[in-house]
């Protein structure tokens, strides 16, 4: 959140470190396989027992599309060429799933929607921040 929100909501001007913030997130592994994660690696010790049992790593390496959409829009402002593959990856997920999911499993190469351990949880869909992604898609139509 702290990486993207100040710039996205224009609390901090881009000139005061947008490029550096985006690069730091990428170097830290928060933007791979797709932005944006809370952590590059899971730290189970930080999860309470209920979280470990039902939704492990939910706020760890999972890819959060709300933050990812903000990261993408900022990247489009800072470095349009670097944003293109991220935009296309998000576009592919939306086309594949037919919706914007809240969270993807960051440990899965194919970026499947996040599921809890017992099959009683599936990442929400049709998220409102999909409009942030839609703006990016509209500005850069697919190939």
Please report, for each region that a protein language model flagged, where it lies by residue.
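Extended glycan-interaction surfaces of carbohydrate-active proteins
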Residues: 1-64, 88-143
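Active-site-proximal substrate-binding groove within the catalytic cores of carbohydrate-active enzymes
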Residues: 60-86
């Amino acid at each position: 959140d702290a990486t993207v929100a100040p710039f996205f909501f224009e609390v901090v001007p881009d000139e005061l470190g947008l490029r550096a913030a985006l690069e730091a997130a990428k170097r830290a592994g928060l933007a791979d396989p797709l932005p944006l994660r809370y952590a590059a690696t899971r730290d189970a010790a930080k999860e309470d027992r209920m979280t470990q049992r039902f939704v492990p790593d939910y706020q760890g390496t999972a890819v959060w599309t709300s933050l990812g959409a903000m990261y993408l829009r900022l990247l489009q402002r800072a470095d349009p060429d670097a944003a293109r593959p991220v935009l296309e990856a998000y576009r592919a997920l939306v086309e594949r799933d037919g919706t914007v999911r809240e969270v993807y499993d960051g440990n899965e190469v194919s970026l499947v929607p996040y599921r809890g351990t017992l099959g009683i949880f599936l990442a929400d869909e049709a998220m409102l921040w999909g409009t942030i992604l839609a703006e990016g898609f509209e500005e850069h139509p697919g190939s």
